[in-house]
Design a protein with these regions (language model features):
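Acetyl-CoA-dependent GNAT
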Residues: 3-76, 87-89, 93, 97, ...
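Conserved GNAT acetyl-CoA-binding A-motif
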Residues: 94-105, 128
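Conserved catalytic-core motifs of GNAT/GCN5-like acyltransferases
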Residues: 105, 118, 123-140
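Short glycine/proline-centered loop/turn elements that form peptide/ligand docking sites
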Residues: 87, 110-113, 130-135
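Accessory recognition modules or surfaces
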Residues: 84, 137-146
Length: 151
């Protein structure tokens, strides 16, 4: 991993949860992140500075596909390329695992995230109607094909 990105440990859970609370209307619980560390210990990554965790990203490995569960950067650190660095790291992990493709959902209104996903090669493939529970917003579905790419 580059630019200070490293695998998440159970000791990072509180810092990751703080970023999650700041970033999402329906955040995961601290218990959920701690459970991820025991059930999925190799698929969450963080970036930190001297003050602690400033961003994180997660990946579920399901058969030959990867599902990006969440990616977030503290508001004070947005616009510095950390989200792109985290997503690029997850793509590298997916390739190392031999995944065929990666997918994610994002709020249709989240233009900055959608722009980033498209910049990194993700293709819009559809919509999940009323996906987000807080306001029934639709989710845009994106896929990135890894199979056949030059690794």
């Amino acid at each position: 991993m580059s630019k200070g990105i490293r695998r998440m440990t159970v000791h990072d859970a509180a810092g990751v949860h703080a970023v999650e609370l700041e970033s999402f209307a329906t955040p995961w619980t601290l218990d959920a992140f701690e459970a991820e560390m025991t059930q999925n210990p190799n698929a969450y990554y963080v970036v930190a500075d001297q003050d602690g965790i400033v961003g994180f990203a997660g990946l579920w490995h399901i058969a030959d596909e990867g599902h990006i569960t969440n990616i977030a950067v503290k508001q004070s650190h947005r616009g510095k390329g950390l989200g792109e660095d985290l997503l690029t790291a997850l793509i590298a992990v997916g390739r190392a695992l031999g995944l065929r493709a990666m997918t994610l959902e994002v709020r249709v209104s989240n233009t900055p995230a959608r722009t980033l996903y498209e910049k990194l090669g993700f293709q819009y493939v559809g919509v999940r109607k009323r996906y987000y529970q807080d306001n029934n917003e639709d989710a845009a579905i994106y896929w990135l094909e890894l199979e056949g790419e030059d690794l």
